[in-house]
Amino acid sequence: KWLHGQWTDNAQDFWDDFTGDGLLEKETVSDSVGCEFAQFHNFSFLKRREKIGSIGAWEELQPGEERTFEFVITWYFPNRVKAWIEFDEDYEKFQRGEYGTVRNYYATKFTDAWDVAKYVYHNKERLESDSRKFADAMFHKTTLPYYVIDALTANITNLRSNLCFRLEDGTFAGFEGIRDYIGCGYGSVPHVWNYAQTVAFLFPDLEKTMRNVEFLRETDETGCMSTRMFSVFDQERYAMVPACDGELGSVVRVYRDFKNLGDVEFLKTIWPKVVLAMEYALKQWDLDGDDVLDGQQNTTYDIEFYGPNPMTDSIFLAALKCCEEMAEIVGDEEHHQLYADAYEKGSARADQMMFDGEYYIQVQKEIDKYKYQFGKGCLSDQLLGQFLAYMAGIGEILPKEHVKSAMESVFKYNYKTDFYHTDSVHRAYAINEKR
């Protein structure tokens, strides 16, 4: 245990002790008068709250002899704030103790950090073996090019950060991102998590809990899905315009998750709310009933698209195709035929309306009437629905040759070798020599 002290007393005492003989002794106790500032203000550097300690192990070695020292570092923070904490006002409420607490899932499995350490010790061989098998498959026994491996592994690491967590009832949840002390983008946002695939394919049982929340708890009687999952903390429903790509993407993810798990009961339980969500989509975003979306479509960009556009409409087509197949599995013949007809008509019409011979465009005659539209531009995200369709295993939702042409166009018009001559006042994800 380190000396508590003021200023850097703790580090100084540790360093003096350690550099003396390489061994760790009990902290030094001093009766010397400290800094008087502490009598006037609660300076953190004078009245420290944190407790610090060090662990050391030693052996006497002969010249050239080697010895391995293993340490098991575990932690146990059983409770978390029962609220989404993102903004300053949320953090201030937390500091005032206005929120309750809820247990983390691992608190239902272990009693303390020592219990966790014992589990690691007794299962070390299996845990190490499984971890190495995964690493070997990812890095050493694959034919994937390096840039694909880099993209995959860079995103997988998010799972072991504070970005996401699991609550005591088993529900998996997460932010859009994290800052150094709080989250950013709270609520397991469907139109953000829509594009993540890691959890679904590595831990499908966790991913399934997100679908249960989205449909069974956050989709109302009209079929409208909330854009943020506040129910996981028993907070009031988040009031905001629904996200077209998020809600329809969640429909696709239901089928993907069913295929990953083979859980028919999961599908049967969630199916009525899926039907409601699709009814809402057809009324809210397909205003003229031609199975091509043309209404006001809120998206993950935090803007709305107006009129037919390939980004949201490709997700809509993927949702229709998934629903056609799911309806057959659960024995809902009426909706099976409804979705089959809508998909067939919608796919043909969307391709006819939006494919310009090279890629898919937004169809909007009054393009200047609305801000932030891309019109005839080559949107890099134009085939997100096709991507989700592939992830759900339903193949092409648009003509294969047109999909190929559109993908080639995305690369042709959007790939840059550097950003020295690209002006942007928006969020900068790449500058100068980055690509």
Predicted regions mapped to residue ranges:
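The feature captures the catalytic groove of carbohydrate-active enzymes
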Residues: W2-G20, E25-N42, G53-A57, T68-V120, ...
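Substrate-binding groove/exosite segments of carbohydrate-active enzymes
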Residues: E36-A38, S44-W58, E65, F69-Y76, ...
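Long, low-complexity segments enriched in small/aliphatic residues
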Residues: K412-Y413
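Short, intrinsically disordered, charge-balanced linker/junction segments flanking boundaries
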Residues: I431-R435
